């Protein structure tokens, strides 16, 4: 019987070309700088501190150039607590605490941040795009040393702004942190095993119409793209009722329901696509004119025009930057 399944090697599909000076270079000539992120301890952040953290992220993102992708990735992996029982000098309470929590399950949280410099053509690429449609393979931005230098300077400024806060700490990942060493695996190893182990075995990856599987892990992807699934209002943090009282508030981040409150192995991804804001606003202006011309045929067109006009008025008066965003949660069972 003939096997019609398509089998290929990881080397042929691997999107990275090389790692140069601590930066990941893709086969499409995108440059990515990776960071390890340290966040405050859970349930210790106040509402004012959440606001300060949000302001720091906002300030840092605004220094990045156009056609930059900000990707924050939160890994939540189920583990069992392993205390260091053999440590000497522990007090009676410390030893009792270690025995109490020994082997208890918990979600291990690790955070990574990726800043990618791409180009306008890549940012707007669709599935029907072909390299035969352009006269050169490499984008001109990657061959312009000045553009690369400006991006790296913006990354340095981004890192300084975040590290100036008291709550967040960024650590730039080096080549050995990404690809690993003979003794310890790197970040790229985790994608092939979905494991925290130092040197996990390489697993087969199956991409099918009905499922995606890495080794024994079956993956389920959920995207936050439908407006009906989004809340009517947003904030930096929310009150966690289970640990709050009449006299005290326990605050969690607004995205906690798809993050640490999701009791399974999962990866929560947040993408921000920074494009030319002026071009985006002009596109909204054109869309508003189209809605106005079609308002006589449908009341929904009239309502959409009012919403677009309201956004444009606020964006122009307050200097807002129009970006695109995408959020998804990758659950593995």
Predicted ranges, named:
Residues 1-331:
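Extended, folded cores of ATP/NTP-driven motor/assembly subunits in large transport
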């Amino acid at each position: 019987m003939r096997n019609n399944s398509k089998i290929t090697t990881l080397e042929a599909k691997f999107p990275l070309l090389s790692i140069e000076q601590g930066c990941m270079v893709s086969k499409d000539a995108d440059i990515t700088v990776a960071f390890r992120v340290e966040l405050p301890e859970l349930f210790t952040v106040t509402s004012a501190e959440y606001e300060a953290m949000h302001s720091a992220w906002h300030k840092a993102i605004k220094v990045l150039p156009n056609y930059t992708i900000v990707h924050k990735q939160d890994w939540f992996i189920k583990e069992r607590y392993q205390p260091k029982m053999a440590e000497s000098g522990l007090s009676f309470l410390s030893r009792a605490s270690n025995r109490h929590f020994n082997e208890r399950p918990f979600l291990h949280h690790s955070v990574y941040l990726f800043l990618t410099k791409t180009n306008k053509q890549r940012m707007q690429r669709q599935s029907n795009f072909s390299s035969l449609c352009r006269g050169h393979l490499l984008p001109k931005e990657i061959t312009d040393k000045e553009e690369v230098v400006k991006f790296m300077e913006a990354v340095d400024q981004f890192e300084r702004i975040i590290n100036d806060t008291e709550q967040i700490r960024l650590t730039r990942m080096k080549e050995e942190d990404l690809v690993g060493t003979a003794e310890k695996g790197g970040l790229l190893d985790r994608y092939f095993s979905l494991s925290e182990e130092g040197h996990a075995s390489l697993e087969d990856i199956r991409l099918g119409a009905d499922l995606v599987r890495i080794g024994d892990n079956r993956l389920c992807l959920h995207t936050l793209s439908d407006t009906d699934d989004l809340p009517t209002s947003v904030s930096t943090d929310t009150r966690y009722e289970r640990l709050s009282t009449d006299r005290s508030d326990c605050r969690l981040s607004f995205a906690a329901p798809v993050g640490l409150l999701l009791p399974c192995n999962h990866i929560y991804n947040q993408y921000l696509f920074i494009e030319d804001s002026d071009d985006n606003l002009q596109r909204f202006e054109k869309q508003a004119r189209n809605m106005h011309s079609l308002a006589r045929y449908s009341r929904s067109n009239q309502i959409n025009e009012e919403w677009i006009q309201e956004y444009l008025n606020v964006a122009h008066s307050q200097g807002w930057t129009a970006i695109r965003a995408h959020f998804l949660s990758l659950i593995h069972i």
